[in-house]
Structures are given as C-alpha cells and as structure tokens.
C-alpha cells in the first residue's frame, strides 16, 4: 500500500516504469520534436524516468479506490484511472510528461538559436574595433638619445 496516496497500491506505479511505457514516451517526444533540430532527438531512459518520478511524486490521484470507487464524477470509468487497462496515450500523467519534455527541448533550442542571432555589435552601431584612434602611442623614453 502506498502511504502517500490513499487507495493506490504499489503495483500501480510499476506500470509507469515498464520498458514499453518508457519506449512509447521516448517515441512520442521524438515525434513532437522532429522539426526542432533538423534531426530526431531521442531522450534517454534515465531522463524519462527522472521526469516521470517527479510527476508521480507530485501527482495527486482522484479520491477513492483506484478503479471506479471514486467520489469525483470526472473519473467514472476505470479505463481512465487504471493505467494498466487504459491505452498509454490517454493516461494523463504520461501525456503531461511527454508535453513537459518536448516543450523543454523546444525552449532550449529556441534559446540557443536566439543567442546565435543576437549580438551587441550590430545593434546601436557599435563596432568591434573603434574607427577613431583613441590612444596615441607614446614614444619609447630615451630612445631618441641613443647614438652608439
């Protein structure tokens, strides 16, 4: 029995760590980020498991038992709440994990592209080297009197 959430047993979370679920999440993230870097981006299983564990720790399931005995009318069917019976793409936690990872990847690549485009030099007509000679070279002392 999971003491964190009442009505959830420990086998409910084992489904999320199944290799099929992790592979589906990785494929879904790769499909959502196809046009970002002009190449497919495959997220490692370790990263997916870390994000999934974070979402599962912070996720508050519906009130009541895992399958059907709930006080919340939005969770009437067992398919929507029991992860082992529902299709993967309808699971709300998995969908949120896919959206979070793909949005993070898109944001990182857009920040990198914006950083490459913007520079301080072309804006405000600032140039890398000054066109005006600011500092005159000082003559080397005692050089004018060396006659030997």
Swiss-Prot record:
The organism's place on the tree of life at top rank: Viruses
Protein family according to the UniProt entry: Belongs to the IIV-6 395R family.
Protein name: Uncharacterized protein 001R
Organism, scientific name: Invertebrate iridescent virus 3
């Amino acid at each position: 029995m999971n003491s964190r959430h009442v009505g959830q047993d420990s086998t409910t979370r084992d489904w999320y760590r199944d290799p099929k679920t992790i592979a589906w999440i990785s494929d879904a993230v790769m499909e959502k980020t196809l046009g970002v870097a002009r190449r497919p981006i495959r997220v490692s299983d370790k990263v997916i498991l870390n994000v999934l564990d974070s979402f599962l720790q912070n996720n508050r399931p519906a009130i009541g038992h895992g399958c059907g005995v709930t006080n919340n009318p939005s969770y009437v069917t067992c398919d929507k709440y029991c992860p082992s019976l529902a299709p993967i793409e309808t699971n709300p936690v998995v969908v949120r994990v896919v959206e979070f990872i793909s949005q993070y990847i898109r944001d990182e690549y857009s920040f990198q592209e914006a950083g490459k485009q913007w520079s301080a030099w072309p804006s405000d007509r600032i140039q890398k080297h000054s066109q005006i000679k600011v500092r005159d070279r000082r003559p080397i002392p005692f050089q004018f009197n060396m006659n030997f």
